[in-house]
Amino acid sequence: MSEQPHKQRTRTKRASLHEKQDQVRATLSEELREEYGQRNVRVNVGDTVEVMRGDDAGEDGEVTDVDLRDAEVFVEGVTVEAADGEETPRPVESSNLRVTDLDLDDDMRVERLEGDNE
């Protein structure tokens, strides 16, 4: 693997979608870390997250959309006001989030979380 920054950025940008899933991971809260024995997890729609960095730091909200192509996460309540006054969702990088509550409707996700803990 190359050490050159422009090649690193190109590889990240051109990654296929199954590889980009690793780019939308966020750290777990302390309670969830102890419960599942993991430090971070892939962000899914329905998870409750806290924004840790940026203008919206401290905001809590539910994940409304995850864009794998651009590796962006959209959080309920994190918006930017357009010039005409309309509120539009602001994309947040997953590294700037902390997952405080997981959406466990997916059985496969539950198995994956609990399987690493054994």
UniProtKB/Swiss-Prot annotation:
SMART domains assigned: KOW
Gene3D superfamilies, per database record: 2.30.30.30
Keyword field: Ribonucleoprotein, Ribosomal protein, RNA-binding, rRNA-binding
MF terms in GO: RNA binding; rRNA binding; structural constituent of ribosome
Origin superkingdom: Archaea
Annotated spans, Disordered: 1-24
InterPro entries per the UniProt record, alphabetical: KOW, Rib_uL2_dom2, Ribosomal_uL24_CS, Ribosomal_uL24_euk/arc, Ribosomal_uL24_KOW, Translation_prot_SH3-like_sf
Alphabetical GO biological process terms: cytoplasmic translation; ribosomal large subunit biogenesis
Gene Ontology CC annotations of this record: cytosolic large ribosomal subunit
Coiled-coil stretches: none
NCBIfam families assigned: rplX_A_E
Stated role: One of two assembly initiator proteins, it binds directly to the 5'-end of the 23S rRNA, where it nucleates assembly of the 50S subunit.
PANTHER family named in the record: 60S RIBOSOMAL PROTEIN L26 FAMILY MEMBER
Self-association and partners: Part of the 50S ribosomal subunit.
Family label: Belongs to the universal ribosomal protein uL24 family.
Protein name (database record): Large ribosomal subunit protein uL24
